[in-house]
């Protein structure tokens, strides 16, 4: 049974952007997939809607709500859901960070078990809108039967979604016409413009550990697309000029950009972790340090970790490596840094083995570049601070992001062997120095700085949010419904 924790109060409502007199207050429910790369943008979007004076109910599971306590705005109503027990999941596993990628299929199975609880919430509270994620394939039809307007908030980049399939039916039936490796490693025929956005052969090989039996991600996403009144993207028109109209054409549904939702730098300067890292960074020359982070969930092999480490050593550059011991391709794999690496690079390298405050690190004046896996959130955070990117994509959307960003000349992708994806220390070192040290890196630095100005334009961001909320107000349930009637 769900447990609604009300943080909202009349005083808080009065301090938010007041609703124009002739508009009704909406009730918007939001329900993300159980991955923090999804949960945090959903929570941020929820806060922005609430700040416009609307009631927002944020749905997630009990343990995740507890983890989010410092992020939750008092304007938001929190709805705690009890995740059904699935035998194959570890005890208390309620997010993708809690499980090996092989077991994410069971987390999706558990989320599917939330259907009765979420349905009861919708029946009893009758929100005007429900904003959901790609996994919740069963939710659009339930919401439609209750007269609730439906939006899919996609935290994946629009070019990735456009690449995956030409229509929701193609997603559902796994029938986009691509049957060969060559088909999948060239831009699809439904792209009406030239682009480098496509997978390579070694990208396809890396997908295998993520494939699982049961309801496919394609089916889930296709059903979500098919049942939605609109699609929401964490994007600017300026960065998705071609892609957003293409998605509208492919899926025949309105596509609404909500802005980039850039995160805020935490205000606690006395955080012990940050104090230690800052002290190290303060001792380095301005614009000299490369920040390295590959996310907390990607599968990275022992060979890749060794070559990346030796490449950092070979480059001669100062670095901070947020090294949360990666998960190997199999559960039994043990991934370790090469012997002696930490000691040999101690004078110019900091290997941080627990959680690292990424935004704070990227904001420090000594940082000059970002070696990243190209997750969509990390891209925004790196470019917010004008850092050129050294890109080492791992799987799924990350290679597609890297191809587009390399084409826009905000960084370069570290070369791999085209057949097997093998990485070498020489390619790592050469890529780092090309972006950070050599003259050829000046174009990447200049373009990253230019994007930083766009990403930090608060006026533009506020306009996107206002237009998005205005869309919700004008299109709720197709006709205005007074909550008091």
Curated annotation (Swiss-Prot):
- What Enzyme Commission number does this protein have? 2.4.1.-
* Family annotation (Gene3D superfamilies): Glycogen Phosphorylase B
SUPFAM superfamilies (UniProt xref): UDP-Glycosyltransferase/glycogen phosphorylase
The UniProt GO MF terms for this protein read: UDP-glucosyltransferase activity
Q: Does the keyword Lyase apply?
A: no
Q: Which domain of life is it from?
A: Eukaryota
Residues where UDP-alpha-D-glucose binds: 296, 355-356, 373-381, 395-398
Residue spans crossing the bilayer: none
Protein family per UniProt: Belongs to the UDP-glycosyltransferase family.
What does the UniProt record say this protein does?
May glycosylate diterpenes or flavonols in leaves.
Descriptive protein name: UDP-glycosyltransferase 91D1
Species name for this entry? Answer: Stevia rebaudiana (Stevia)
Query: What is this protein's gene name?
Result: UGT91D1
